[in-house]
Amino acid sequence: MKGFFENLFRQNVRSVINTGKKVGARAAAREIINQEWGYPLANHEVLFLTNVYQPKHMKRHPFHIVRGTVAPLAVTLPLGFFVLNYFGVISSKLGLLIALSSFIGGLVIWTISIIFDSLYDQQHTYEVKRGLVMGMMMFIISEVMFFFSFFWSYFYISLSPNIAIGCVWPPYGLTVYSYMGLPLLNTVLLLLSGAILTDGYTILTEQKAVHEKNEKVLAVEEAFKNLMNLYKTKNSINTLTFVDERRDKFFGKESRQEDKIAEQKLIAISAGVKELRDLDWDLYFFENPENIEPNYKEPTNLSVIEYALITIYLKKRNKVIKTRLYFTLLCAVVFLACQGYEYFFAPFSMNDGIYGSLFFLLTGFHGFHVLVGSILIGIITIRFIVGNFNLLNVGTNFQIYKNKSTGFACTLFYWHFVDIVWIFLYIVIYWWGSR
């Protein structure tokens, strides 16, 4: 509740009073909405995320400060158990199941911890985000080196096949996949998923809408018109309108108690008990610039209307983005299912010479990356569902270090890397390798 007043009224009440007196309620509200859409730190954000992105919590340090967590141990210890189990030092199905559960749980805890570091502790500053993006880039480069070595092996044996495999490629007598069918379907699925995910990220990070014919502006103007019509029909049938319900939600019993506390603070300051700097946001309920008689009801209604408009827009925007995330996940799941079907009914196995080994190594390693990318997209989807992205301004495509969607951007980079690797796989293995 306090966050609402502290961030919304502190900067806007005076301008609302003055503007409302001069040009009317509608123009005043529209002016506030237009102004708020232009700032990277919007005042209304605390309506959706308590104690998140408040100016007093913003950090300006270059250090990567993290919370204490058991996640690293929960992830690394099971890996050691997997190695011991692979070499037969430890043989226990129950222990293997416990280790797998610990590994997955550690990854979940680690992800939640990173999100808390960013959102609630505000530790992901510009420099930290820059380091995170650079870390993801370096990770992708290291993965490129992995695939480079695998492709090198493939070209080394395929461009100059020896007599052991009949001096031909693919090896003589081996039935291979055609580049049509499932491989082509998988290519379409991955490219489509990349385009859909990019579109979702573009919608999230679009710049301020300034053109009158912009779809966003038209939608908000229509919503404003509908809300004002509801406001004019107040108490028509002894019922509260949408705006009144919103106002009562924010200005109920708790608000009256805060007003009382604010009045006590003002009296204490007048008596010299407290200094002026201790008052903070409460002063706006009792002071007004230029001795203008304050109209508390009008700014209250205007701020509620502003909140309602933003709620309507965010609901529509996030619904569109979540739909794109769902489609991306669907494409990824279908891709993995097609890969599994291809492996199960493959006319050759990993033991069928060098071709089978390289085929399953390249496609399997890529499939693992698709699985990891799907998990990352799933995390972004869950964050949208729980409301981590209920923010009007999250930055732009060209402000990766400054915006509030760095995780989404890194996931997008990784997914495009997966797409590009698959294109090379499709051309080299399925098309050129089957001719």
Curated annotation (Swiss-Prot):
Name by which UniProt lists this protein: Cytochrome c oxidase subunit 3
Subcellular location: Mitochondrion inner membrane
Keyword check for Membrane: yes
Principal cellular location given in the protein's record: mitochondrion
Membrane topology category: Multi-pass membrane protein
Source organism: Dictyostelium discoideum
GO biological process, one term: mitochondrial electron transport, cytochrome c to oxygen
Transmembrane feature ranges: 70-90, 96-116, 132-152, 176-196, 325-345, 360-380, 412-432
Annotated gene: cox3
Sequence similarity: Belongs to the cytochrome c oxidase subunit 3 family.
Function: Component of the cytochrome c oxidase, the last enzyme in the mitochondrial electron transport chain which drives oxidative phosphorylation. The respiratory chain contains 3 multisubunit complexes succinate dehydrogenase (complex II, CII), ubiquinol-cytochrome c oxidoreductase (cytochrome b-c1 complex, complex III, CIII) and cytochrome c oxidase (complex IV, CIV), that cooperate to transfer electrons derived from NADH and succinate to molecular oxygen, creating an electrochemical gradient over the inner membrane that drives transmembrane transport and the ATP synthase.
Reactions that this protein is recorded to catalyse: 4 Fe(II)-[cytochrome c] + O2 + 8 H(+)(in) = 4 Fe(III)-[cytochrome c] + 2 H2O + 4 H(+)(out)
SUPFAM superfamilies: Cytochrome c oxidase subunit III-like
Keywords: Membrane, Mitochondrion, Mitochondrion inner membrane, Translocase, Transmembrane, Transmembrane helix
One Pfam family here: COX3
Enzyme Commission numbers on file: 7.1.1.9
Record InterPro entries: Cyt_c/ubiquinol_Oxase_su3, Cyt_c_oxase_su3_dom, Cyt_c_oxidase-like_su3, Cyt_c_oxidase_su3-like_sf, Cyt_c_oxidase_su3_a-hlx
Quaternary organization: Component of the cytochrome c oxidase (complex IV, CIV), a multisubunit enzyme composed of a catalytic core of 3 subunits and several supernumerary subunits. The complex exists as a monomer or a dimer and forms supercomplexes (SCs) in the inner mitochondrial membrane with ubiquinol-cytochrome c oxidoreductase (cytochrome b-c1 complex, complex III, CIII).
A single MF term (Gene Ontology): cytochrome-c oxidase activity
CDD domains associated with the record: Cyt_c_Oxidase_III
GO cellular component, as recorded: mitochondrial inner membrane; mitochondrion
